[in-house]
Amino acid sequence: MTLLAVRHASLGYSRHPVLRDVSFTLSQGTICCLLGANGCGKTTLMRSILGVIPLLKGEILLDSLPVQTLSHRQRAQAIAWVPQAHDGIFAFSVLDMVLMGLAPTIGAFSVPGKQERLKATEQLEKLGILHLATRRWNTLSGGERQLALIARALVQQPRLLLLDEPASSLDFGHQIQLLDTLAQLKN
């Protein structure tokens, strides 16, 4: 079954297309990698899939529904996004940042329970950063932040996971660990 369908999409900013007539489909369990030069539109495409950047032409369907017709909460429940960089100055703990990934499911102002905390610590452990759980976000390195954001996305258990240059800040060992984790998701 088709999870994501992009049909004849043209996208960009202020009527200036970055990408024109893009079409592809992805089935559940598919791993797809977008390759291209810096500035060619990879991030713009992902942000359009998220519904953040409107299409100039065409359509994007998630489970056969136009993305733009889904509520913010429906999109957040179905799609997890890890940006290239996240510079927050917040003093939240890493565990709290990962738990924020559950907000679309449990509610933005709900207090995560024991079950949610267990899910979050499992993701931190999978990525080899459980030891960072109590560290403050604003004290982390770029690679540590990237891994924490990936853990936050994984704890959501989304139907679609969008990762924008997920390994760019990671050392070789964590790159391998990330790829292993993603391969396990496919199965």
What spans do the regions from the language model cover?
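The feature captures the beta-strand-to-loop junction immediately N-terminal to the Walker
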Residues: 35-37
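Helix-to-loop junction immediately C-terminal to a conserved catalytic motif
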Residues: 50
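Conserved ABC transporter NBD signature motif
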Residues: 58-66, 75
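Conserved ABC ATPase "signature" region
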Residues: 114-132
